[in-house]
From Swiss-Prot:
It comes from Listeria innocua serovar 6a (strain ATCC BAA-680 / CLIP 11262). Its EC number is 1.6.5.-, 1.7.1.17. It catalyses: 2 a quinone + NADH + H(+) = 2 a 1,4-benzosemiquinone + NAD(+); N,N-dimethyl-1,4-phenylenediamine + anthranilate + 2 NAD(+) = 2-(4-dimethylaminophenyl)diazenylbenzoate + 2 NADH + 2 H(+). Keywords: Flavoprotein, FMN, NAD, Oxidoreductase. The gene is azoR2. The lineage of its organism: Bacteria, Bacillati, Bacillota, Bacilli, Bacillales. Binds 1 FMN per subunit. It holds the Pfam family Flavodoxin_2. This is FMN-dependent NADH:quinone oxidoreductase 2. FMN binds at S10, S17, R18, S19. Quinone reductase that provides resistance to thiol-specific stress caused by electrophilic quinones.
Amino acid sequence: MSKVLFIKASPLPNEVSRSSQVAATFIDEYKAKNPSDTVEELVLYNTEVPLLDLELMTAGRELQAGKAFTDLAPDVQKRLNAYNALTEQFLAADKYVFVFPLWNLGIPPLLKAYVDTFVIAGKSFRYTEHGPEALLKGKKAILIHGSGGIYSAGPTSSFTHGEPYLRTILQFIGIDVVPSIFVEGIDHNPSKEAEIVAAAKAVAHESAAEF
């Protein structure tokens, strides 16, 4: 039995977000094919995702130096507890499904803040004399990515730092990232929205059966 963490990184409701609609198709098919697996949904825009800032970095250094957790300020304790809970939730999963849009050629800022909760030296990778070593080998992820333009291939593919960034950072910590599902080009061809979404859902249906 596998534990799947379904991470939604869009503030838009499902009826507006086409990538979320495709992700719902993927999840429904996955559950049908894997009834004994558990799927936990994490909606980032409904979740406290602490930003890795000076306060948290200072608290981390103080704890490493021997300061007791209870000696930290109450608000810092609360933020660290939220941060650490996200870390442990991510590490406990076997598979990951990310759905996220392309914003200004990158990922949403809250998704980047979330990435910082699990890409941690000593947790998901470690430093060795031969360089960094991934610690999450054997886990699997799929990325479902929405964009108004077409960036998965063609002349604009080198512009994007969305799907390639998330794929790279997950591979860095050892996770096997299977081929992504793209929901793209609707802003270029609004009249083809239904066709584009249907094609992406068909890919999602097939991908879920193999995930």
